[in-house]
């Protein structure tokens, strides 16, 4: 099942990226807070990613045909004092990336989607928007290159689950086995 899911995800990503190959460098950006398990999909995803930019540059003949992939985990505003968008702009410029793949945890609107789907889009994303912590948008308009968003819903607002919680938008829940699910989803992405 895992191999089929990974192949399906790779195929969908290929259709969303406007180009491929060594002449089309990509920056993979893991967004979120590494210190919060439900928000830590990205470090696990980046750990499983084959970063090739340094190899393509150092040994161009041996790595001909490889896409140049760089990775960045910019952290959160509270830890860095910088908006994720600012860090990504600098990285896109420094690496000459032609596209960004932004990986983030999301808030589910339905319990059926919680840790059960991978959402893809070509319009970018707004970090933190699912939990009411709106940051600056990460999209083609703000970065100057296409942005493919890869998101996994890992939390759900308690207000969506039942009576007595409708007015509380500050309480978010995760599955009991969130550690295992985040590890699996990070590896899949």
Predicted regions and their residues:
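Conserved active-site and cofactor/substrate-binding residues in soluble primary-metabolism enzymes
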Residues: 4, 8, 40, 44, ...
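Extended, charged alpha/beta regions that create polyanion-binding interfaces
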Residues: 1-26
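A structural signal for small-residue-enriched, beta-sheet-centric alpha/beta enzyme cores
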Residues: 72-73, 102-189
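Structural motif
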Residues: 25-27, 99-101
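Solvent-exposed alpha-helices and their adjacent loops that cap or buttress functional pockets
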Residues: 19-22, 61-65, 92-95, 111-112, ...
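Gly/Ser/Thr-rich loops at beta-strand to alpha-helix junctions
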Residues: 30-40, 78, 105-109
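Glycine-rich phosphate/diphosphate-binding loop of Rossmann-like nucleotide-binding domains
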Residues: 33-67, 71
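A structural-propensity feature for long, helix-poor, extended segments
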Residues: 62-92, 96
């Amino acid at each position: 099942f895992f191999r089929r899911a990974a192949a399906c995800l790779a195929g969908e990503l290929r259709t969303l990226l406007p180009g491929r190959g060594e002449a089309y460098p990509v920056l993979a950006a893991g967004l979120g807070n590494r210190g919060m398990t439900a928000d830590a999909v990205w470090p696990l995803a980046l750990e499983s990613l084959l970063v090739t930019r340094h190899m393509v540059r150092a040994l161009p003949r041996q790595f001909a045909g490889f896409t140049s992939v760089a990775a960045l985990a910019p952290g959160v505003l509270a830890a860095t004092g910088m908006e994720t968008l600012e860090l990504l702009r600098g990285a896109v410029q420094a690496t000459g990336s032609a596209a960004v793949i932004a990986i983030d945890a999301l808030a589910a609107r339905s319990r059926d989607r919680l840790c059960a789907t991978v959402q893809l889009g070509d319009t970018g994303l707004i970090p933190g928007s699912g939990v009411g912590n709106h940051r600056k948008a990460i999209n083609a308009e703000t970065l100057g290159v296409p942005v493919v968003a890869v998101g996994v819903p890992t939390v759900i607002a308690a207000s969506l689950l039942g009576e007595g919680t409708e007015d509380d938008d500050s309480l978010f829940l995760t599955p009991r086995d969130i550690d295992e699910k985040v590890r699996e989803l990070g590896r899949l992405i």
